[in-house]
A protein has these predicted regions:
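Alpha-helical transmembrane segments of multi-pass membrane proteins
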Residues: 39-42, 156-163, 203, 207, ...
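Short, highly charged, low-complexity non-transmembrane loops/tails of multi-pass membrane proteins
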Residues: 220-234
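Long, contiguous internal "core" modules enriched in hydrophobic/ aromatic residues
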Residues: 1-142, 159
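Short, membrane-exposed interhelical loops at transmembrane-helix boundaries
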Residues: 100-106, 172-194
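Central hydrophobic cores of alpha-helical transmembrane segments
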Residues: 146-155
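Juxtamembrane non-transmembrane "cap" segments at the membrane-aqueous interface
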Residues: 2-11, 158-179
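Membrane-interface transmembrane-helix boundary segments in multi-pass integral membrane proteins
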Residues: 106-120, 186-202
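Membrane-helix cytosolic exit motif
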Residues: 207-223
Length: 234
């Protein structure tokens, strides 16, 4: 990272890759692969829950419940070790007074404990996710598991992102030069840009409301075999 390079009118780039792999060397870290596989099975879980909620076919729903159980087991076997390892590993602490980045034992666990409200959000997210999955598997007449599970996933992912960047933490550590790790402080935009983004963010509730309305309009009628057989199919 070289912030002075922003004065270069030809190439005002303040950061660059340290080698020609352009970040692909991250694949050599087995834990990144574990996380990627966990996300893969999580996507399959949510997709299965969506099918159960939106396809009016009991045979397909029964098969989907079995697939949900298998994918949930695979997800937990991958995600739980990753989460435990992340909370117990050394983290990248940032000193706001000096700008120095250093290693700190169990930094992410301490972030979770220091910001107790994130712990509450994490707990709520986990409970919602488990509720959506368990009730869908155990109750044949329950089809709305996508809603609590989906909300739970959003909350858990949000907490993981925040403990990786808040509380003076480098969210994108450098494997080559520790002091070149990216933090919120050294990678944020100018005050003008941040002010503009803050104003634009006021419209987010309206965007979310539109998304909710559109999804409701699309999903209020369940998909049936007759619908698939007749008319245009997309």
């Amino acid at each position: 990272v070289d912030k002075m390079n922003i004065t270069n009118s030809v190439a005002p780039v303040i950061s660059h890759w340290a080698n020609y792999s352009h970040g692909l060397d991250a694949l050599l870290d087995i834990w990144n692969v574990v996380l990627g596989l966990a996300v893969f099975f999580l996507a399959r879980m949510l997709g299965t829950l969506y099918i159960i909620n939106n396809v009016a076919d009991e045979t397909l729903r029964a098969r989907s419940r079995k697939q949900l159980l298998y994918n949930t087991a695979a997800f937990l076997l991958l995600f739980l070790p990753f989460l435990i390892r992340t909370l117990l590993k050394d983290g990248f602490a940032y000193d706001p007074a000096t700008g120095v980045i250093s290693m700190e034992s169990m930094k992410y666990l301490y972030n979770l404990l220091d910001m107790w409200y994130l712990s509450v959000v994490l707990l709520v997210g986990v409970v919602l996710l488990l509720f959506g999955i368990v009730r869908t598997v155990m109750c044949n007449n329950y089809i709305k598991g996508i809603w609590p599970a989906g909300i739970g996933v959003v909350l858990v992912v949000l907490v993981l992102l925040l403990i990786a960047g808040w509380n003076n933490t480098a969210y994108y550590p450098s494997n080559v030069d520790l002091q070149s790790s990216l933090t919120i402080a050294n990678s944020c935009s100018s005050e003008f840009t941040l002010t503009t983004m803050s104003i634009v963010s006021l419209f987010i509730p309206f965007v979310l409301a539109y998304i909710v309305y559109v999804w409701y309009a699309m999903d209020k009628d369940k998909i049936t075999k007759e619908e698939v057989k007749q008319g245009d199919v997309y």
